[in-house]
Each structure stands twice: as structure tokens, then as C-alpha cells.
Amino acid sequence: MNKMLYIKTYGCQMNVYDSNRMVDLLETQGYNIVANMADASVIILNTCHIREKASEKMYSELGRIKKLQQSRLKAGKSKAKIIVAGCVGQAEGEEIFIREPAVNIIVGPQSYYNLPTMLEKLDSGTENHLIDLDFVEAAKFNKLPEVLKSPTVSGLVSVQEGCDKFCTFCVVPYTRGAEFSRPLEQVYREVLNIAQQGAKEVVLVGQNVSAYHGKDENGKECSLADLIKYVAKIDKIKRIRYITSHPNDMTDQLLSLHATEEKLMPFLHLPVQSGSNKILKLMNRRHSRERYLEIIQQLRELRPDIVISSDIIVGFPGEDDEDFEATLSLAKEARFGQCYSFKYSQRPGTPAAVKQQISEEVKQHRLSILQAQLMQQQLECNQKLIGKVVPVLFDRDGKYDGQIIGKTPYMQSVCIMNEKDNNLYGKIVNVKILTASASSLFGEVYADS
């Protein structure tokens, strides 16, 4: 049987991790990954539900797949099996079958380990529509195979899933379930595995990774700081990052680790969502503007060169001009070096979705103002490195022939022209920064490297 797999990933780094694990899982069943959807016998869309636009992208893609299926039939080929995985599948369930009957399997983010069994049922011809949306977190990791290959020199490892915070705008507690942390040794073994395959950097990921509370082999509960210190013992791992955190779970132990653990990179993504205490309360964020800025100040005292990244939502129901100005001032005071900003998007089933909504025009106007400020802040952050020599981990080819791209410790992309055809992929090399834009740095290998 022709077993060709195509997978398209939407959304967060957790979804990227899940897609990689689905590939590992199905490769053990004889599937080969293909780059062209038209060549696939199985097509997986691993979906995101965080914003309305993200889920609509999936339906648009399903429309294109239906046209592809028709072309296959005309050419005398069989249809590909279509799988909707991830958070849209979890949130919308059988409604997807109603809207798009061409979909064969719907599987949630905690139950995709059952894909081999579900595909076997499809092959037997006894079923045409299958669905599995169980929240059985431990089973997922216990039943997945070992990572077969680290996709890049920077590997993602899921350590924590789900969220118990219930922010009023967010679907994560409903699509990913309650907070669950993997055992310490299980995470360590996975990091060791990808390190032995060439990964130099590990990114510990979770919906609320700073709430990690996995247990060691003796049943003792461990914090994220404990996990980072343990993973740092792996010699081949040179860089450690973690994402995404919640301010309420940033303990003194974790903050202090930024000053003492040399493998922990001087970068932190810490979403704030709003600079207004009124809006933070309406969002059920459970922290204040002042507390957030205290954390940032503490981090900068511990690690003066740290770069802070964040997420901000504009146009949340109830946000007025004064609230928006508070967000602008917080972004400036926090000196975000990077920031992802979005218009509020109603998500069905969340408390904020039923409130009085702000007009699209006002949301777009505020977003434009905020993004202009953030772009300038990011440019200024990048320009500070001009003339300096920084260690860069090269992990991918650039847009142009001979160009290679890597990351600084501060998560900035660095482009160089690899004119001497040196094999820099997977290496940490000192680079002198020559110029900077808001999105990238440009440099050359430092002569003394």
C-alpha cells in the first residue's frame, strides 16, 4: 500500500511539537513524509483554535483539498484520507463532519496516539468517519514512540500541557484540558535523545510551562527550575529556553535561575495581554500591571541583558481609550524587544464572547498604533547589537544562495553570507553584527571564531 503522509501545522509551538510526534508515530507504521500534498495518501491538518481566523484557515484548506481529491479521481487515483487534528478538532468535533463530510478522522491534541488504529479501521472499509477527543494526557506520552529524529538543531520538547487559569478570552482550557506535567525523567530522556541526534538547543514548551510540576522517580514534585537544572546536565545541550509562561507562576526560584544557569538563554516570552488593570481583571488574568512590571524589573536586576517578549490583545470588550493608553505605556516601560499583538477575537464558549464587543474599525486602529510602537522598540533593541560580537546558533538556510540564518541568545534572527562554504549548520559561531532591521540582524563571522 502507498503510505505517503503530508502534514500542515497551524498555530503555536506546541502544535509544531505535536506534528513532529505524529510524524514519528506514523513513520513506525511505514508512512513516508512528503512535501507535496498531491503525493499524499494521508493528509493531516494540525489545527489552531486560538483565533477565529486560524480556524477559518483550516476550512479554506479543506476546500482546496476537496478540489485536489476531484483531480485525483479524474486521474484514476484514489482519494487521500483527510485528518483534522488539534484544537479545532477538539472544539468543534462532529460539526466538522457536517460542514466538511470529506474529512475522515477528527482527533484531539491529547488522543492522536490512536491514529494508527483509526487509520486501520478506515483501511478495513468498516468506517468512514472516526473521532477521538478524549482528554487522557498521560496515555498520550506513554504510548508515543521515542523521537525518531530531531527535526533541527533546536528541538521542541513538550513538558506541560493544558491550563487551569481560564482567562476569559482563551479556549485553551477547553481544547487542551487541565494542566498536566510530564514526569521529570520522561522529559530528560526525550531531551537526551534529541541531543544525541544533534540538537544543540532545547525549547521546553507548554501552554503554561512555568506551572510545570512533574514528579521525579521518587514521587517528589519538581518545578520548572528543577527541570531546567536537570536538563542542563546534558553536555550536548548548549542552550535552553522555555515557552509560554504566566506571570503568576514566575517564582523567585525560576527568576533567579536566569542569573545562575549559563545554558538558560537571556530571553523570556511572558504574555501580559493588557496594560490596564481594569482589562486584566476582566480577562481574569489574576495579576496586575504593577506585578508584571515588578517581575520584569527583578529579571533585569538578575540578568541585565535579558530580552523580554510578550503577547498583547487590543480591543478586548470594555477597553476604552484610557485602557489602550495604559497598554501603550506598559509596552514602553517594559521595553519589549519582541511582541506579538492581536485584535481580540471572539471564541465561542468563552466568557468574553458574550460581552459588548468593540467595533472592528476601533480594534484595527488601536492595533496599528500599537504595532508601530512595538516595531520601533524592536528596531531599537536590535540596533543595540550593531558592532558587537554575539554567539549565533545556525539552524537553517536563508532566502538567497549562500545565505544561512541562526539565532542569537536573545532570539533574534541573524543572516550571514556563507561565502567560504563553511559547514556552519548546527554550530554556535561568533558573529559581528553589521546592520539591523526590526526583524533581523545582518553580520559576518568574526575572524577570531
From Swiss-Prot:
Name the Pfam families on file.
Answer: Radical_SAM, TRAM, UPF0004
Listed under catalytic activity are: N(6)-dimethylallyladenosine(37) in tRNA + (sulfur carrier)-SH + AH2 + 2 S-adenosyl-L-methionine = 2-methylsulfanyl-N(6)-dimethylallyladenosine(37) in tRNA + (sulfur carrier)-H + 5'-deoxyadenosine + L-methionine + A + S-adenosyl-L-homocysteine + 2 H(+)
Q: Which Gene3D superfamilies match?
A: Methylthiotransferase, N-terminal domain, tm_1862 like domain
Q: What is its main location?
A: cytoplasm
Where does this protein hold [4Fe-4S] cluster 1?
12, 48, 87
Source organism superkingdom = Bacteria
Keywords for this protein:
4Fe-4S, Cytoplasm, Iron, Iron-sulfur, Metal-binding, S-adenosyl-L-methionine, Transferase, tRNA processing
* GO cellular component terms attached to this protein's record: cytosol
Record-linked PROSITE patterns: MTTASE_N, MTTASE_RADICAL, RADICAL_SAM, TRAM
Q: Where does [4Fe-4S] cluster 2 bind?
A: 163, 167, 170
The free-text note explaining how the cofactor binds reads:
Binds 2 [4Fe-4S] clusters. One cluster is coordinated with 3 cysteines and an exchangeable S-adenosyl-L-methionine.
Q: Cofactors per UniProt?
A: [4Fe-4S] cluster
Any idea where the MTTase N-terminal domain is?
A: 3-124
Q: Where in the cell is it found?
A: Cytoplasm
What residue stretches are annotated with the Radical SAM core domain?
149-380
Listed GO MF terms:
4 iron, 4 sulfur cluster binding; metal ion binding; N6-isopentenyladenosine methylthiotransferase activity
The TRAM domain, residue ranges: 383-447
Signal sequence span per UniProt? Answer: none
Q: Which CDD domains match?
A: Radical_SAM
State its Enzyme Commission number(s): 2.8.4.3
Q: What does this protein do?
A: Catalyzes the methylthiolation of N6-(dimethylallyl)adenosine (i(6)A), leading to the formation of 2-methylthio-N6-(dimethylallyl)adenosine (ms(2)i(6)A) at position 37 in tRNAs that read codons beginning with uridine.
Question: How would you summarize the oligomeric state and partners of this protein?
Answer: Monomer.
* Family listed: Belongs to the methylthiotransferase family. MiaB subfamily.
Protein name per the record: tRNA-2-methylthio-N(6)-dimethylallyladenosine synthase
Which organism does this sequence originate in? Orientia tsutsugamushi (strain Ikeda)
Gene responsible for this protein = miaB
